[in-house]
Design a protein with these regions (language model features):
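Sec-dependent N-terminal signal peptides
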Residues: 6-8
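Short glycine-rich, polar/acidic loop-and-turn segments at beta strand-coil junctions
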Residues: 10, 67-69, 100-102
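Mid-length scaffold segments of soluble, non-membrane domains
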Residues: 85-135, 140
């Protein structure tokens, strides 16, 4: 009789355990589904945060930016004014960081994190590397914090670029080319390890 009671008790205990685990698992999935449903109803950012990166001979180069889209608008000379400092993205300043010193447009820049701004114009753009990468748009931009300014000539692209895009292409063991494109224009410049 004792054996029979022990077997029945063991069977009851074993049969109850999986039900509790399933209940906990079901509850966890229900909570997760609710979180997913809430997230599904939130609007997508019209200028999502993006990043591009590469490593050139051990130098990790990393760019973070917000990527606005054309959405039927005229960009250069419209949404983005000519001859004004532009964050070259949306929301916060675009940041560029690298783990080793490098050279841009003939100037040595120490490893670190910086803001990347531009001043678009119809014939020539000014590219700016600035110390203050933690700023909203160009609201706190100060020219005296620039560590580098140089000129580039924009090129017309064959296929319009709907969203602002940054790309870094490794050219060889020492150099890479940073390309920024949007609408029907692109600018490019060389980043070189020292």
């Amino acid at each position: 009789m004792k054996k029979l009671i022990a077997i029945i008790s063991l069977a009851i205990i074993c049969s109850c355990s999986p039900v509790e685990e399933k209940t906990k698992e079901t509850q966890m999935h229900a909570d997760h589904s609710q979180t997913l449903d809430k997230g599904a109803h939130q609007p997508k950012s019209k200028s999502p945060k993006q990043m591009t990166m590469t490593t050139i001979e051990g130098n990790h180069i990393h760019i973070e930016y917000h990527s606005p889209s054309m959405r039927g608008r005229k960009i250069f000379g419209g949404l983005v004014a000519y001859n004004e400092v532009w964050v070259t993205g949306a929301h916060n300043a675009t940041s560029i960081s690298f783990t080793k010193d490098l050279e841009i447009s003939g100037k040595k820049i120490e490893a670190g994190k910086y803001a990347l701004f531009t001043i678009p114009d119809q014939k020539e753009w000014t590219v700016i590397i600035n110390k203050n990468w933690e700023q909203h748009l160009a609201d706190d931009y100060k020219q005296e914090e620039d560590i580098l300014r140089f000129k580039v000539i924009p090129t017309i692209v064959d296929t319009p670029q709907e969203s602002l895009t940054y790309k870094i292409e490794n050219l060889d063991d020492l150099e890479g080319e940073l390309a920024i494109s949007w609408e029907n224009l692109a600018i490019k410049f060389i980043i070189k390890n020292i």
